[in-house]
Structures are given as structure tokens and as C-alpha cells.
């Protein structure tokens, strides 16, 4: 009777459509009908399972069977021989490079002048704000000649002195005391007083009419930059040419210089260039130690390695710009790894770059690949690493070591190169590859008052999480074990020798810079001089 009423309700629906009515609480179907329905549902479920299982065994996409556009050999050839830029300056096309004058490479916009009486704070501001690699020092604004330079190596030397981390030699002690007196009296400290603290590379000048062969020979001997002067106008400065600019010029116009162009396809291990004496520092060491090493050794950058000599970072004197504010002083007593995270954060926030500051090649890299990477990254040196060495293949790396390692990588990855004796420290735990190393932005730390209380800056700043130690960084996955370094000097020295020139020995130039270093490492604490420099506030 109930079923009949339901059928009548469907028939009386105004649309004439079959709309199912709610089923009553008591199912009126017979047991046989219900069991048949269950069997049908079960059969449908089995059919759906079989269909889903058949999808799992579906044939692969045709893309997987498509041949790659480039073979592995073609890709490797492209890496070994990257194409030079096509926008070559037509002014140099078809010309013999020996007839091109160095004056044609200068740009007047590169000139940034300060005077001998300019204060260290003003000079620091000018150096950083202008984004210039070096400032030229002249006697007065009316003079057109240069008497010296002020760059980040000079700033690093003064920073260490201001923080009380270096002590001048005996012959400069009187100048040091005079600086301390001026700082106590809050007088301006002029550059002419500061320059005595850092006897860096002497000023080198070349006439604008000198050809590129003279420049290549000069730079190949270890000179990093030359001041170009007008010899017909009382030595007036017309520009600055650096090693990087010359290497970049020769790379972009290499096809016009066959003597140089034939070197680019060759491998580093066959050319025999680069230094096997590499100075590095463990990432867990304090930043001030890295700055002291660069100052005392006369180098502009230092490799940061983990406990197995894997390169995990790079610190250069240019990075000192991040330490010129009073709030940044505690970074000096934090780890090198932490400072690398600060460098990364500054690059991301200020320059919009997202890159890890490790620039490296290996002994099987071609000269073309090496120079192209230098030009692209604007690096003055690239670390030579052994990419085949596992992170556990070597003993713990000393905190500061100058090791003699072969430039060419060994084919046996289990054989470790000779290194200096391990540091007398306990072994750190194995790297934890599951823990990411994310850079943290720079944090404001303390005010300038901490200068007079050095102990207050030793601890971890409030609100800053400790950085991941170097022992936990996956250095081997990033680069490999450090086995050498190749610099702009090495490349230009090679170009000079290939051209039949006789450049000076770069090793002798490095030795002169070490001998001329006017500072010796000390733990003397003095905050008086620092007030002048660290008055740059956030």
C-alpha cells in the first residue's frame, strides 16, 4: 500500500519527473532483492578497482622516449667553452691588441676623490655610498694628481685597530698614540694619519698612451690596479684600470687576440696556473680572526671551510662595509658562518640577489669557463675544489692553515692530500644534511657604548639565533674539498707569458705585501679610536 502511494505521488508531480521519495524506516524490498543489489554494488566496486589499477600500469608519456635536444657531450662542451658576449665594442674590432692604449679603457665616472685632510668617517661614507672599489687621495681639491688610495683593505686595517684587535709596529707606536689622543678629544682623524697604519699596495701609475701589453705585464706581476695619467698634462689623473676590467676586456674581445684566444679551451691542470698555497679559516672561528688574517697576509679574501676542508663560503675585505656601524660590532666576535648569512641577507635585501657566495672551479675546468665565471660573478679569485672528494675523506681542517695541495685533483677519491696538523680540538658531529641553513637578516645589536666594554660584545646578541656550525654544513654537496685558488693575477700572468713578456713573480708581490703589513695580531683592547669610525648609526 505504501509503495502504491509513492507511485501516485510521483505521477502527480507537476513536472512529471521521477523524483525519489525518502525511503521509509522499514525497507519493503524482499531479502532476495536486497542481496542482488549488494552483489551488483560489490561487482561495480571491483570493476572500479580494476580500472584504477590499470591506470597505474599505463604506458609512459611519449616525452620520456623523446631524444634530448643536447647530448651530454654537447652540454659539457658548452660548459667548457661558453660563448663570449656578442656586443663587442666595434672600436676594437680587427685591431691588434698591442696597439690599443690603456687610456681607451678608462671611464671618467670611476674617479672618486678625497683629500688628505678628509676624515675617516667621511671617507668611509664616500667609499660605501659611491659603490666605488677605491678612492683616490689628493692633497687639495685643486690638485689633479693622486698621492694615494683608500680602499676596503685600508678600512679593514683601521677597523681592526679601532676595535683594539691589532697593535702597530714599534716605529708606528707614536702615530697610534696620536690617533688615540685625537679620538679621546673627539677630533677628526684625517686620512693622512690613517694611511700610515696600512702600508698596502703602492700607488702604480701608467701613462694613458701605454699599450695593453704594458698593462698585462704590470698586472701579471701582482699589481691590482693602476692609475692612468695624462703624461702631457702634468700627470693629471684621467682614470683607473683594474685587473678585473682588463680581464673582462680581453674576454669580450678575445677573438681579436689570437695569442690569448687559443688559451681559453685548455684546462687549468694543463696550464698549471693557480696557487697551491691556500689560506683558509674554519667557519666556526670568529670573524675578527678572518679579518686579522686578511690584514696580516695582505690578501683581499679568504675561503671559509668546514671541518673537512670543503668550501662553504667566502669573506672579502669588501664585506667590511657591513661592519662600520656601531650596532654591527658584536659580529666581530660571532662566527664566520654567521657573517656569511649576514652577507647573504644584505645581498638579498639591498641588491636583490639570491646566491650562495661560493665561487669555485675544479682542475678540469677550462680557462674559458673560469674567466666566464669570474666575469659573471665579478670575482677576483675562484677557489679550486676537488668535487669528487666525499666530505668524510679528510681530517678535520685547522682553524687557520696554509696548506700545500696539488692543483690537479687525484683520481682516487679516497686518498687525502697532505694538510697541516689537525687542530687540537675535539671532533665535531657529522654533518646533518636534513637541517637547512637559512640566512637570517642582520639584526641591530648594541650601541657604541659596547666599544668601551669589549666583554659585553662577546656573547650572543639578544634576539639572534645561533648560526648552524660549519660542521653541520653540507659543504661537499656545494663545492668540494679546497685544493687551490686561481686569481685575476694568475690569468693575466699567463696572458703575459704567452705573449712573450716577462712579468714579475706574483708570489714575490704577495711577499712584499706581507712584509709591508704594519700590524701584528694582538688582543689589546681600546675603544677610543673606534668612536670616530663607528659613529655611523642605523
UniProtKB/Swiss-Prot annotation:
Alphabetic keyword roster: CBS domain, Cytoplasm, Nucleus, Repeat
GO biological process, one term: regulation of mitotic metaphase/anaphase transition
Biased composition (Low complexity): 21-40, 422-432
Cited SUPFAM superfamilies: CBS-domain pair (SSF54631)
Function in brief: Involved in DNA replication and cell separation.
SMART domains: CBS (SM00116)
Protein name (Swiss-Prot/TrEMBL): Protein sds23
Species annotation: Neosartorya fischeri (strain ATCC 1020 / DSM 3700 / CBS 544.65 / FGSC A1164 / JCM 1740 / NRRL 181 / WB 181) (Aspergillus fischerianus)
Family listed: Belongs to the SDS23 family.
Region (Disordered): 1-69, 386-448, 500-538
GO cellular component: cytoplasm; nucleus
Gene: sds23
